[in-house]
Amino acid sequence: MKSLLLAVSSGLAVCVATALAQSDTATAKKDETKIPASSAEEVAVIKTAKGEMIVEFWTDVAPKTVENFKKLAKEKFYDGTCFHRIVKGFMIQGGDPLTKDPAAQARYGTGDPGYKIKAEFNDRSHTRGVISMARSQDPNSAGSQFFICHGNPSFLDRQYTAFGKLVKGDDVLEKIATTPTHPPDRPNKRMGVTSIKIVPANSMHLP
């Protein structure tokens, strides 16, 4: 299996992160899923062990990525998964269906929905709270795994598909991103995703 290595430097220290890596599996289908036309304005409500985060979507720059995420969420694909990779000051990564099984930790980070989607790299910068698609070395290898930026990793711009941003729940992001971890960037305590629901934006009390 192949994985992507990212070098993240801070001052004189350099740490090599595989945080955005998503391994290719032999059984994964490489055909692209058919995405339905974008629906009315909606947001995602990510219910976690630490509280709720609400994501607004950038359908103007990543329409197929947004619709794929919505499709999976509506199918309850993400329910019962967890944030399996956490790098404080960088990002939290989730969306792997294999994380539904606590006994499969050795394979965390390799799961997908059985298909890949094409990249929609765009000019939106990776700043705190931005949600983007994880992938392997192949630019068109994203499937279901995503990450939410804890820091401002602008070096990822135009290399990963940013498709939305938190509009509520920054405190929840902070709690998850600062939880104690052990190699390889696994949280000591499971950071579960109870559900991801897609709801009309006008049904939420947003700032």
Please report, for each region that a protein language model flagged, where it lies by residue.
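Cyclophilin-like peptidyl-prolyl cis-trans isomerases
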Residues: 2-9, 15-207
